[in-house]
């Protein structure tokens, strides 16, 4: 809805606030959340939700896109940054990333799809208004 820059900033700030108020910041995962927001913003730009259309094709595109973004962020970005920033053991990282990626992808797939369908229904469909 707002684009890749907003997605990046929202991902960074949202994850950082949760970490700061809970147990302390884990920068590799904060950055991965920002990258997820960036990628999602890029992918969602292709959906054209403002047209009021969010059918089967758009649902599939959204879910394939968010799945790719989760694989990149939690299977690559977070584990690599954990190694670079925190010198974490390799065995643990990819198992952690895989688990987080699967859970996040399922959550995004279910909740995200429901929210996007609901949002699209609030938009006026192209060609639904006639000039008199």
Spans of model-derived segments:
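Loop-helix junctions at membrane interfaces
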Residues: 1-132
């Amino acid at each position: 809805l707002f684009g890749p820059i907003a997605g990046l900033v929202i991902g960074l700030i949202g994850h950082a606030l949760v970490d700061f108020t809970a147990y302390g910041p884990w920068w590799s995962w904060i950055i991965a959340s920002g990258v997820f927001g960036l990628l999602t913003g890029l992918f969602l730009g292709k959906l054209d939700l403002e047209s009021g259309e969010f059918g089967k094709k758009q649902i599939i595109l959204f879910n394939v896109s968010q799945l790719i973004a989760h694989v990149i962020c939690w299977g690559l970005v977070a584990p690599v940054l954990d190694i670079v920033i925190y010198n974490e053991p390799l065995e643990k990282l990819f198992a952690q990333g895989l688990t987080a990626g699967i859970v996040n992808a399922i959550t995004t797939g279910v909740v995200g799809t429901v929210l996007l369908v609901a949002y699209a229904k609030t938009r006026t469909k192209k060609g639904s208004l006639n000039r008199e």
